[in-house]
Amino acid sequence: NGRDWWVVHKRYVVSGSSDEVYVYLVSPTGISQQPVQHIGRASETNGLSLRFSPSGSKLIATDSNQYLELFDFDRCTGILSNPRFVHQRQVTTLNGLFWSSEFSPDETKLYLSTVEYGNNDSISCLIQFDLLAPDIQASMDTIYNFYLPYETGMLKLGPDNKIYLSQYLDNNDCGFFYLYCDTTFYPENMNISVIHDPNQSAALCDFRPYSFYLGGHRCYHGLPNNPNYELGPLA
């Protein structure tokens, strides 16, 4: 209706796994929980993020254990359906953790950032998938590699239809989820990267690393999680 909001999250079970999805409707009358849905892969990690497509009709679940699962979403009922994998873990394919995903404005491409994790991983990647390909996982195309101490972070579609990517400078061994240990500023963490034409193929998407200046500030692994205020009603 262009007024209410859906809040969606997957349940995390310590020392176990769960396929439970919780959906809440936020309206002027309050917050109401919808029936719990059992759908998709049972995840065993709390390193999981959810991202809606620009139209709100699709939802991507990014599992840090190298799974990407795509769902259809009914904006009127809050019901998820049609789960299918964009990527399933293959030991020989990628190292590191899957960190963040984002749709292109036309919803034909999906972008993924991975972060290095562990002593044997020194590369973080920006990757594109073609959601219209007969075999989506086989369409995986690496756009750019970041080498330690530089790591990728969060992907976010902006109101200008460009996709922004934060970076993290891991130079002080403060731990994976912590802020910098010092006050040193570097070009690599004072600028974020930009995909200027994300509807295009990987070769033509015009990715420019470290190209958007943050006005003297530093970035980390994350970006703001802003809702899409321009979505409007379906009818």
Which sequence ranges carry the predicted segments?
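Beta-propeller fold recognition
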Residues: N1-F73, T77-V86, T93-A235
